[in-house]
Structure formats: C-alpha cells, structure tokens
Amino acid sequence: AEFDADGKQNILDRSEMPLPLGKNVFTSGIVNQETQNQLIQVLKRYREQLQGWGISPEETYCFASSAFRDAKNRDAIMDRIFVQTGFKVHIVDGIEENKLMYLAVTDCIKDQPIDFKNENTVILVVGGSTTEIMMMSKGKMAGVHSLRLGTVRIEEQIKNQTSSYSDIQRFVQESINNTKGSLESELNIAEVKQFIAVGQDVSLASLIVGRPISTFLWEINKQDFSDFIRDIQEYSVDECVARFKMSYSEAETFQVSLLIYN
C-alpha cells in the first residue's frame, strides 16, 4: 500500500497463500519441518514480488500472530526465516492484535452509516486458535475477550466424533455459553445493535448472501446468513473447493468458521 499526503491509503498489490501453521501448532505444539519448508518457499515468493516494487526484506515488516505465539519452536523458525529470506519476523501479542483489528475496522467504517458513538457494538474475529471479541459501549471499549474457540481447535476436538451440523453447532454454543456470564457483566448483549464480523470466510459469505455498502463493507441479513450456513454444512470439502473457488486448507475450516460467527 502507499499513502498520499493526506494519509489516504491506496492498495497497490495483494497476495495470499494458505499454510497450515495453526493446525501444526494446535495438534503438536510445534511447526513441523514440512510446513517450515512450505513457509520458507512462500516467503521467498513474497520477497520476489516485493523486489518488483523495489522493496527489500530490510524495508519490510513481517508480523506473526497466534500460531507463532503458541509454537514451542518459534525462535528457531524465526532464525531460519531471517537466514534464508532476510525477513525479520515480529510476533504480535493478543492485546496488540486486538488494537490493530480495532483500528482497521474503524478506518473501514469511518465514512459509512454505522453509528459507533450511540449504539452498542460487538466486533468478532474468528481465527484458527481463538475467537477475538471486542465489545463497544457507545463508542467506548467495554471489554476484550479471547476465547479458546478457533476453527482448527474445533476440528481437532470433534474429528473423532460424529461431526454433523447439530453436533458442531452444539459444541460451539456450549463453548460460547461458558463465557457468556463474563461478557454480560461488561455489556448487555441484548442491547447490541451492531455486529461487525471480520475475516476471509465471512467476507466470502457476504459476497454470496449480502449486499455491498462500500468497497470493503458488506451487510448480511441474519436469517439469510443462518440459512446459508445451514445449507453449506451438507457440502463436502471438495464441494466447497469447487463451488467457492477456495483452497483445500481454506475449505477444511470454512463451515466451522461460519458456525462460530452465527
């Protein structure tokens, strides 16, 4: 991205490569050798892309979040990344991650008809390891919670059980109910008028059943969203790949991710 004199952001280029870092860490506590090799290859491709813009690894900031934070061998991997690619990786802690997400959301909606100052709002971000919840009471932060409820964690806990739609839905609901008391002590959930969901999976859902408000902001009717989630639970991973043009690793957690948002 580049920024003009007024501080306005202009996206120049964008790249994304799926990698099962989270699945490694949440199952074994480490990033295994095969995934490390894949990570190095991805970063080398990014390095080549950046070189096309005249940007060196020394001028580039690399950030890692929950999967790296939890990996027992993170220091060794960071050293390997630096030696083989030139990128220096910075690990973002949970508090900073929430702050950056809040800033990103407020920047996205600043010129849109969303009333932060007079309405109660919940911002939800579903990841592989955790689900981050930010609660806003009339423009002020009322509470921040990190639930141990992520797509990869759920997949691992239910993979040896029957994984029907109702089973997964029940598991997610029970996990959320365990923390509902602490959430209610900070903000009356019944009074929340605005629900802002952030993430690739919910963005895809918005393209299918939502309506655009701006370039990066979409609105989804709650019932349409629930109906869509129920429909896709019948799809296999291969069907999700074919229907939604996503990678296999993305398709593996797509259905569970949307269940958490719902």
Task: Please give the residue ranges for each predicted region.
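Active-site-adjacent helix-turn-beta-strand microarchitecture at beta-sheet edges
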Residues: 127-130
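N-terminal glycine-rich anion-binding loops that anchor highly charged ligand groups
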Residues: 9-19
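Helical "lid/coupling" subdomains associated with nucleotide-phosphate turnover
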Residues: 3-5, 20, 24-57, 67-120, ...
